[in-house]
């Protein structure tokens, strides 16, 4: 079984967006989550303690020659408990206006889910949100602006697989929190613009970061 989060074209509407699932090793695919022709999947996180539980973030966006649009009615957070066959929104406690989103469920505690959310920058409504009940409700734990400073291009969040209170955020810079997102320290690793992070599930000190 393979899942793909497809963001889709940036410059116009298309039906080729959302969450796709393959049951035959990639030979054929089914779109299991589609919102609208302007909203693609920006992230997918699987609960490794129960792989039928999936969390997906959808992002409505357009990059036009004269402006960039991030956010809209299509942006939102979704959960499936049956391997992607059915989805429902989980937005209790989140801002009404959502832009780009990233999500990560903790392998150390399946009830804890981290959500990095772009929202109205003028009102500073975005930041890092945490759910302690598997997405039923959310609370903002940090409004530190640098966590979403390059949200159009890349914002990522990664829960440490062995410690539910350690979480990493990648943006123009890389950050780590060891208190569940309340405070942050910068990670220095050569060039900035960090895009991805792998943490060894058997040894959290063994990591690979890419820019």
Annotated model-derived regions:
Residues 1-211:
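Beta-propeller blade termini and top-face loops
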């Amino acid at each position: 079984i393979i899942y793909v989060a497809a963001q889709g074209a940036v410059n116009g509407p298309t039906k080729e967006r959302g969450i796709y699932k393959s049951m035959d090793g990639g030979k054929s695919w089914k779109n299991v989550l589609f919102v609208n022709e302007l909203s693609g999947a920006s992230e997918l996180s699987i609960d490794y303690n129960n792989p039928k539980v999936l969390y997906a973030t959808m992002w409505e966006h357009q990059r036009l020659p004269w402006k960039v649009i991030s956010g809209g009615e299509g942006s939102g957070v979704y959960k499936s408990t049956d391997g992607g066959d059915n989805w429902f929104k989980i937005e209790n406690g989140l801002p009404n206006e959502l832009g780009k989103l990233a999500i990560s469920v903790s392998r150390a505690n399946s009830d804890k889910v981290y959500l990095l959310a772009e929202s109205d920058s003028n009102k500073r409504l975005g930041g890092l949100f945490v759910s302690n009940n598997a997405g039923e409700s959310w609370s903002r734990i940090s409004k530190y602006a640098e966590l979403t400073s390059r949200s159009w291009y890349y914002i990522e969040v990664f829960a440490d697989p062995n410690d539910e209170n350690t979480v990493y955020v990648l943006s123009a810079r890389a950050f780590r929190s060891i208190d569940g997102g309340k405070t942050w320290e910068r990670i220095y690793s050569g060039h900035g613009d960090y895009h991805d992070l792998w943490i060894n599930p058997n040894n959290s000190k063994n990591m690979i970061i890419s820019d």
